[in-house]
Curated annotation (Swiss-Prot):
Domain of life: Bacteria
Family classification: Belongs to the RRF family.
Molecular function GO terms recorded: ribosomal large subunit binding
Entry function: Responsible for the release of ribosomes from messenger RNA at the termination of protein biosynthesis. May increase the efficiency of translation by recycling ribosomes from one round of translation to another.
NCBIfam families (UniProt xref): frr (TIGR00496)
Protein's name in the database: Ribosome-recycling factor
Record region (Disordered): 141-169
Subcellular location(s) of the protein: Cytoplasm
InterPro entries on file: Ribosome_recyc_fac (IPR002661), Ribosome_recyc_fac_dom (IPR023584), RRF_sf (IPR036191)
Species assigned in the record: Limosilactobacillus reuteri (strain DSM 20016)
Keywords assigned: Cytoplasm, Protein biosynthesis
Gene: frr
Pfam family, one: RRF
Key word Phosphoprotein present: no
Length: 187
């Protein structure tokens, strides 16, 4: 059976992972300015296998609201264009024969509100993940207390620590989401 400290540390690590996962997810939500991470989810059909775009092309930002995609192998240019259309990012690729330009449009107020809803939905998923970690940790603590691994005082102390970690984890998630919402609304 794990010690109370191990249970607490395990819960801390899992809660931190929820924060990292939320940051990665929110990075894909565009805020009206060019960012190569917008294309993280784009997979290009390359020699019969779906391949991340950044492995078949260089992605640069020549202007604040423009991405330039230059394939390492020009034969894959049309596949990149198809993949961008299929990705539902709402971006229209401009193929000049050797590279693709993506102009990032200014976000409309309605689109901003839609994206804020998406941020809130992702935040809620992350909060559920943190709460699930809390529940698992509490279950482990209860088992340990029942088995006599630690006394009632230690159990209550660990219970409080798990709750404090949960509160801190959720606060961290809310801070991440609030920063993204602010970025979207200022755009």
């Amino acid at each position: 059976m794990a010690t109370g400290k191990e249970i607490l540390n395990d819960a801390k690590q899992k809660m931190a992972k929820s924060g990292y996962a939320l940051q990665r997810t929110l990075a894909d939500i565009r805020a009206g300015q060019a960012n190569a991470s917008l294309l993280n989810s784009v997979k290009v059909e390359y020699y019969g296998a779906p391949t991340p775009l950044n492995q078949v092309a260089s992605i640069t930002i020549p202007e604040a609201r423009q991405l330039l995609i230059t394939p390492y192998d020009e034969s894959v240019l049309e596949e990149i264009e198809k993949a961008i259309y299929a990705s539902n990012l709402g971006l229209t690729p401009q193929n000049d024969g050797s590279s693709i330009r993506l102009i990032i449009p200014q976000l409309t107020e309605d689109r901003r509100k839609e994206l804020v809803k998406d941020v809130k939905a992702e935040l809620e998923k992350a909060k559920v993940a943190v709460r699930n970690v809390r529940r698992e940790a509490m279950d482990d603590l209860k088992k340990g207390n029942k088995n006599g691994d630690f006394n009632d005082d230690e159990f209550h102390d660990l219970e409080k620590k798990v709750q404090n970690e949960t509160d801190a984890g959720i606060k961290n998630l809310e801070d991440i989401a609030n920063a993204k919402e602010k970025e979207l609304m200022e755009g």
